[in-house]
Amino acid sequence: MTTDLIDVRITRLPHSEGLPLPAYATAGAAGFDFLAAVDAPMTIAPGERVLVPTGLCIALPPAYELQVRPRSGLALKHGITLPNSPGTIDEDYRGELRIIVMNAGTEPFTVERGTRIAQGVLAPVSRLRWTEVETLDETARGEGGFGSTGH
């Protein structure tokens, strides 16, 4: 993957000391992994939601967001997902990045210090301007939704 790198400033909170910064696992990866900055193992019961700290704070450049997404391996093997996926970190947020994690599996799952718990994808943001009109253009689909175009 050939692309220009975008600088994102990052600071560590004390509970993330000793953990590596988020990193891309391969040269072609779109997402980088966030690590759990927990001091003690955290067990997530089936159906439970928890907030997992990363110990990191960032400053995104203007017109970007950071999308937080589940890791496919955790989802497939353990049912670990992010209920608000993708989560959005706005460019003006400066607090600790904490990940809302849910165990949709059937067995408890334990998050250890350094567990790769989620992935982040940097994305450009376009802002819209609403234009209120009396009617909308007609389309072949019209008002069909929720399965109206097939299964």
UniProtKB/Swiss-Prot annotation:
Q: What is this enzyme's catalytic activity, as reactions?
A: dUTP + H2O = dUMP + diphosphate + H(+)
Q: Give me any GO biological process, just one.
A: dUMP biosynthetic process
SUPFAM superfamilies cross-referenced by the UniProt entry: dUTPase-like (SSF51283)
Task: Fetch the InterPro entries from UniProt.
Answer: dUTPase (IPR008181), dUTPase-like (IPR029054), dUTPase-like_sf (IPR036157), dUTPase_trimeric (IPR033704)
CC cofactor: Mg(2+)
**Annotated source species:** Gluconobacter oxydans (strain 621H) (Gluconobacter suboxydans)
State the PANTHER family in the record.
DEOXYURIDINE 5'-TRIPHOSPHATE NUCLEOTIDOHYDROLASE
Binding positions for substrate per the UniProt entry: 71-73, 84, 88-90
Class of enzymatic activity (EC top level): hydrolase
Q: Which Pfam families match?
A: dUTPase
**Listed HAMAP family:** dUTPase_bact (MF_00116)
Q: Does the keyword Membrane apply?
A: no
The protein's name: Deoxyuridine 5'-triphosphate nucleotidohydrolase
Gene3D superfamilies in alphabetical order? 2.70.40.10
- EC code(s) of this entry: 3.6.1.23
